[in-house]
Each structure stands twice: as C-alpha cells, then as structure tokens.
A protein has these predicted regions:
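A feature for loop-to-transmembrane-helix boundaries and adjacent hydrophobic helices
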Residues: 1-245
Length: 245
C-alpha cells in the first residue's frame, strides 16, 4: 500500500497522519460525550485536548528519539521529521498525564475526573492509530507460519499492530462497561493503564522493532511498572475512600 494518500501543491499527505488524526478526533468525540453524560463543561475537555495533543506528540517523539539516539545523534534534522512515523505511545501518555495534572491544578478541577472521562477515548484513539503502523509497514512481529500472518518484505510475520488493535478495542468496551461501576474517581483511567499495559507487555514480546534499554524491551519494562503502579493506586484510593466514609 502506498503510504502517501495524496499530494497538495507538491506536499505529500501520508495515510499515517490521516489515520492518527482520525484516532485523535474519535477519541475527543468520545471524551466530549462522556463529559456531557457526567454534566461536566465540555469546554474543559476541549481546552485540555488543545494542550494535550501537541504535548503528546512532542512526548512521543522525544521518547522515541531518546531510545534511538545512536541514529539521531548523527541525523539531528530527522528529529523533527514525524511524517513517516517514529512516535512512541508511552511518551505520549507520560506527556499527556503531566499536561493533565498541570491543567487540572490551573482549572481547579479533579485530575482523576478528567482522567476517567478521557480514558475510553484515549484507548479508542490508540486502536485506530495502530492502522497507521500497518500503512507504514512497521510495528510487526517475528516470522510465523500461522494463517493470519501478513507478508512484509517477502516474509510472513505476526501482525502485531492488529493484535494490539483488537486488544485495545476490547479494553475500550470494558471501560465503557466499567465506567458506571467504578468505586472511586480515577478507577476507569487506572483500569485503562493496567489493561493496556498487560496487552502491550505480551504483544511487545513478538515485535522485532522494540525500543531497547540494554537487553530489555523498554515497552515491557514500562508496562510492568504501569501495571504495578495502577494496581497500587486503585488499592490505595479505595482504602482512602473507605476511611473517609
């Protein structure tokens, strides 16, 4: 598949950017719908998105560049070239959380409420965004003989982008079900962190393009830490809530 969708005045518009934009748009619409359901001012979510999107893109790129510094140290101008990919979701999430914390403090609203509202939209956006990896022929796995393998450079490989798409869609529907059953604020977001990280840990083990730190796959290290932190925060916040009541 041609990664270039069309050209405007000689400028190539790539499918990767179109798909990522579609993911962001769908995620935002889901968040706005959830804010309306909870009676929150939708402008609060729109303003948050305006700040979080550029912060997330910068965070995603910095994360990717840091763990590929051997290449980028000799190709500094390529650091700002993101049209062909090179964005790491963990960098996005870290930057988005920091942005959300600052935004919540400035607006004097609960960070955990904002996080719960945006969590389903975030995972839906991630699911859609994985198709950008398909177009770019990236984020695929090791060779396989399984019937659903895809051909990349003449080799049949695991479609790990598709595994993550399916997992993320499953997490999306779980969050929609759980949002009306949470015990305390923040649990929808923390469940998102846990479930996404569990899936990412196992899927990452099949990939051949993982960001590495020494001999370790960075995404697996971050995923394990995220599961532990998410679970600990759920337990802590539930106990804290019980003490208050």
């Amino acid at each position: 598949m041609n990664p270039v969708a069309f050209e405007i005045f000689g400028l190539s518009v790539r499918w990767y950017g179109i798909i990522m934009s579609a993911g962001i748009l769908m995620g935002m619409l889901i968040a706005l719908k959830e804010a309306k359901r909870l009676g929150m001012d939708e402008n609060l979510i729109l303003d948050l998105v305006i700040f979080a999107i550029p912060a997330g893109i910068v965070g995603a790129r910095l994360y990717y560049v840091i763990f590929n510094w051997d290449y980028y140290s000799g190709n500094l101008l390529q650091i700002i070239n993101i049209r062909g990919g090179g964005l790491a979701i963990h960098g996005t999430l870290i930057a988005a959380v920091i942005t959300g914390l600052i935004y919540a403090r400035v607006k004097k609203v609960s960070f955990w409420t904002l996080a719960d509202i945006t969590a389903p939209g975030i995972i839906l956006g991630q699911a859609i965004g994985r198709w950008g990896n398909f177009v770019n022929q990236e984020a695929y796995g090791v060779p396989t003989d399984l019937p659903w393998g895809i051909m990349v450079n003449g080799v049949k490989v695991h479609p790990t982008f598709f595994y993550e798409f399916l997992w993320n869609m499953g997490v999306f529907f779980v969050l929609l079900w759980f949002r009306k059953r949470k015990k305390v604020e923040g649990e929808v977001f923390l469940l998102y962190v846990i479930l996404y990280s569990v899936g990412r840990f196992f899927i990452e083990g099949l990939r051949i393009d993982s960001l590495m730190i020494g001999s370790l796959r960075m995404a697996q290290v971050v995923s394990l830490a995220a599961v532990a932190l998410g679970a600990a925060l759920i337990v802590y916040r539930r106990k804290k809530n019980i003490k208050k009541t």
